[in-house]
Swiss-Prot record:
Keyword rRNA-binding assigned: no
Protein name from the UniProt record: AAA ATPase forming ring-shaped complexes
HAMAP family for this protein: ARC_ATPase
GO BP term (any one): modification-dependent protein catabolic process
Superkingdom of the source species: Bacteria
Any one GO CC term of the record: proteasome complex
InterPro entries linked to this entry: AAA+_ATPase (IPR003593), AAA_ATPase_domain (IPR050168), ATPase_AAA_core (IPR003959), ATPase_AAA_CS (IPR003960), NA-bd_OB-fold (IPR012340), P-loop_NTPase (IPR027417), Prot_ATP_ID_OB_2nd (IPR032501), Prot_ATP_ID_OB_N (IPR041626)
Acidic residues bias: start-end ranges: 527-539
């Protein structure tokens, strides 16, 4: 074979065995052999891991079955007293590091206090004091239950610390109880009712006292001063007492004058005392909203009906009064005005030692005085009382500094009755077409109806005489039905006229309220009132007339138509 030659004619040199390309090839072959060995080793390890994983899975399934079997009945009921997170036991040697115990629970089971372990199937984070749990035969917690749903109810008197409260239970027994996990989150306040378990020493859950809540809380009433008729001077006096301190607080501070803390509205029944109290609440809310730049008035009207607070158990009425004022303080602390309105105030706060009742007022009156005096530093709380027996209220309640402003709400006169009738007889009611045509407009026709009703109600005629009062000085006075008129009576008269108009429409087909309907309604209303009150006691009549009973010597009823005879009134 002819060897290749160079151009010069000499033979080509041989390539050495250590050529770089050959070395690279050999290196790659070595790496491949190593990778093959590693792959084989990994495959072997993977097979071992698969076998181990399958074995572990089977073992876990077996353990779960074992744990589940431990939770099967029979089991012991217990209550969690304390949750113990993992920590180093006190007095134990530390060695190379801290010795830590696992999470445990202190429980009370069958009267025994024990420290027990918690099953892995139970969420330890959900364990909290007061909660019910189940223990298996090895005293391991295997299930979480709920709080005891029954038990005695006690009232929180004082919060001792973050996990204890002082409660008052039956027979005024005071006990310090631990708070359950739920109550520790909700933070009970003095006056709150809670269920208690004296066996474990826990206050468990809050209880809503609907007997108090349903009596008191109401948003801003939708009653304004314009909705009240016939009480112009009284409303003006109330607005001066209530609104001026809020509209011009700097002037009052300059003169060293404090706003009044309370108002007493007294006078005959049915003349708008409750409406005035609601209007006061709305007025305060509107003034407060304007001052704070809020578009929507915000406030609260706590309407307390006196007789509903009375309770046969000693101390229960006082507790409810404390709860009411605590509610008022809580709302006032938000910067909104609160009106606490006591209707029928004489039923709660009678003169102490009068002997006219069971003397429960000996403790109720001091409780109210304490609460009113406590309102002194709250600018947003106003106490309003209403009564038609102001002479029966304890003088300590009425003194200046408590109920500062006292306003008598009298029966309406002729002009006042016209204003009240105008609130109920409005042009949008069904009116007779001929009456509207004769008057010229619906508004004028409604005014004519008002005039007819007022004329009949305030007529001084023999048939409208109600009774004759003889005084001890020898004089006498004849009272007419109009002397017993009130806003409630006027509204009832209008309602009677509306019912008569409906009956006329159903029987004759003629639509609309007429003056004849109103006149007949006035007569029927007053004749029904003729025998009320059914008494010869001058004290009762003095209360209705506004005269003092000690000046009245005799009362003689006027003689009118027999009871049950149809009232006068033209046929519509």
């Amino acid at each position: 074979m002819t060897e290749p030659r160079h151009e010069s004619g000499s033979a080509a040199p041989q390539r050495p065995a250590t050529d770089p390309v050959q070395r690279q090839v050999n290196l790659l072959r070595d790496q491949k052999r190593n990778l093959d060995k590693q792959a084989a080793a990994l495959a072997s390890q993977n097979e071992k891991l698969v076998r181990l994983l399958n074995a572990s899975r089977q073992e876990i399934v077996g353990l779960k079955k074992t744990l589940a079997a431990e939770a099967e009945p029979p089991a012991t009921y217990a209550v969690v007293l304390q949750v113990n997170h993992g920590r180093r036991p006190v007095g134990e040697a530390t060695g190379d590091g801290p010795v830590v115990t696992g999470p445990t629970l202190d429980v009370l089971a069958a009267g025994r206090r024990m420290r027990v372990a918690v099953s892995p199937l139970v969420s330890f984070g959900a364990c909290e004091p007061g909660l019910g749990v189940l223990l298996n035969e090895n005293y391991v917690v295997v299930a979480l239950l709920e709080y005891e749903r029954t038990g005695e109810v006690a009232t929180v008197k004082e919060v001792v610390d973050h996990d204890r409260v002082l409660t008052v239970g039956r027979s005024d027994e005071e006990r310090v109880l631990l708070l359950s996990g739920r109550l520790r989150r909700e933070r009970p306040k003095p006056g709150d009712a809670v269920t208690v378990d004296h066996r474990t020493g826990f206050a468990l859950e809050p209880v809503t006292r609907t007997d108090v809540e349903q009596l008191v809380l109401e948003e801003v009433p939708d009653v304004s001063y314009t909705d009240i008729g016939g009480l112009g001077p009284q409303i003006e006096a109330i607005r001066d007492a209530v609104e001026l301190p809020h509209v011009h607080p700097e002037i009052f501070r300059e003169h060293g004058l404090r706003p009044p803390k309370g108002i007493l509205l007294y006078g005959p029944p049915g003349n708008g005392k409750t409406l005035i109290a609601k209007a006061v609440a709305r007025s305060l809310a509107e003034r407060s909203a304007a001052k704070a730049g809020r578009s929507r008035p915000e406030g609260y009207f706590l309407n307390i009906k006196g007789p509903e607070l009375l309770d046969k158990y000693v101390g229960e009425t006082e507790r409810q009064i404390r709860s009411i004022f605590a509610n008022a303080r809580e709302q006032a602390a938000r910067g909104v005005p609160v009106v606490v309105f006591f209707d029928e105030m004489d039923s709660l706060f009678r003169v102490r030692g009068s002997g006219l009742s069971s003397d429960v007022e000996t403790t109720i009156v001091p409780q109210l005085l304490t609460e009113i005096d406590g309102v002194e530093q709250l600018d947003n709380v106003m106490v309003v009382g209403a009564t038609n027996r102001e002479d029966m209220i304890d003088p300590a309640v009425l003194r200046p500094g408590r109920l500062d402003v006292k306003i008598r709400i009298d029966r309406p006169d002729r002009e006042g009755a016209r204003e009240i009738f105008s609130l109920y007889l409005t042009p949008d009611l069904p009116l007779r077409d001929e009456d509207v045509a004769r008057a010229g407009s619906r508004a004028l026709a409604a005014e004519e109806l008002v005039a007819a009703a007022v004329q009949r109600m305030y007529a001084r005629e023999p048939e409208t005489e109600f009774l004759t009062i003889g005084y001890r000085n020898g004089t006498s006075e004849t009272l007419y039905f109009s002397d017993y008129a009130s806003g409630a009576v006027i509204r009832n008269v209008v309602d009677r006229a509306k019912k008569q108009a409906i009956k006329t429409l159903l029987t004759t087909g003629r639509r609309g309220i007429t003056a004849e309907h109103l006149v007949a309604a006035v007569d029927e209303e007053f004749h029904e009132q003729q025998d009320l009150p059914d008494t010869e006691d001058s004290e009762d009549w003095a209360r209705l007339t506004g005269r003092r009973g000690d000046t009245i010597d005799s009362v003689h009823m006027a003689s009118h138509r027999p009871q049950g005879e149809p009232g006068p009134g033209a046929t519509p």
